């Protein structure tokens, strides 16, 4: 059986490869809460042909390249919900929100692709940390209400 140290070294090598292979996106794949978020941002940027903002920019993670320059917030999760900053912590919600879930096999599923306003109108009560949660089940339900014209078009999956 490999030691924790051996496993961590493997993980750090993977992180180094991710950062090298996706350097154009200027993301750090740190082994903390940012890892899934950074991976999700890169997946979504490539799937929807988006320009990513600097890492850790508040609320806005990317902009569309289609000439409309819409703002996009990207969320990735491995659990059954995602968190958003509560309404009083930002000036304007993003034009679009894309939420994906990533399973342990590394496959991702699109959970929501649509207007930011619809998400922010349906968030739960803010927690003490200023974050509001929404379940993936609720996101899937909201997604059914989003017309194709209000979704970002897939470039590739």
Go through each PLM region and give its residues:
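Nucleic-acid endonuclease domains
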Residues: 1-157
């Amino acid at each position: 059986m490999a030691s924790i140290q051996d496993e961590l070294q493997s993980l750090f090598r993977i992180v180094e490869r991710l950062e090298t292979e996706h350097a154009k996106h200027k993301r750090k794949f740190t082994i903390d809460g940012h890892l899934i978020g950074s991976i999700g941002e890169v997946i979504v940027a490539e799937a929807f042909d988006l320009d990513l903002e600097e890492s850790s920019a508040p609320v806005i993670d990317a902009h569309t390249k289609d000439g409309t320059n819409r703002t996009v917030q990207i969320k990735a999760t491995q659990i059954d919900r995602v968190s958003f900053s509560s309404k009083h912590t930002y000036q304007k919600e993003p034009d679009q929100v894309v939420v994906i879930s990533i399973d342990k096999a590394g496959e991702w599923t699109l959970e929501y692709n649509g207007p930011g306003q619809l998400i922010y109108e349906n968030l739960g009560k803010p927690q003490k940390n200023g974050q509001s949660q929404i379940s993936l089940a609720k996101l899937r339900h909201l997604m059914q209400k989003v017309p194709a014209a209000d979704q970002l078009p897939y470039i590739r999956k």
